């Protein structure tokens, strides 16, 4: 089922357009509030399912916050993973190569692998595994060396459809600032 590509990309592009037309930070906050209210609840409940489910009981089961909202977030993470320039090139390549065609997530990601030179096969696990990972961050400041060490630990919940969740790649952007 490739609905997650069509709808995830549509939601992502709508969010980006809205951010360009308004205040980008305010729009992002609104998008995240909606994601946390709708999709996180779905991912943490009995109806948790992958963004690209292998099967479904009813066609209505496909039109969910996971397919739309989480699908958009996966594209946003892809942009972070490959960088803005490679993302733009990958998107241009995707439209040039596949406009008007029925395509798969694999076709979509192949364009970004080609544009960025990165292997994104591990990243595709996001489409097959339900649940919302939790990141726990701890930091340690070494006064003597002036070094900040940030340690991130990911935990993935079991869901009704996945009793053995695996770690998922998560692109992270971080910055540190001095007091002055």
Task: Indicate where each model-derived feature is located.
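Hydrophobic alpha-helical and helix-loop surface patches within well-folded domains
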Residues: 1-141, 150
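Beta-strand-rich binding/interaction modules
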Residues: 119-121, 130-180
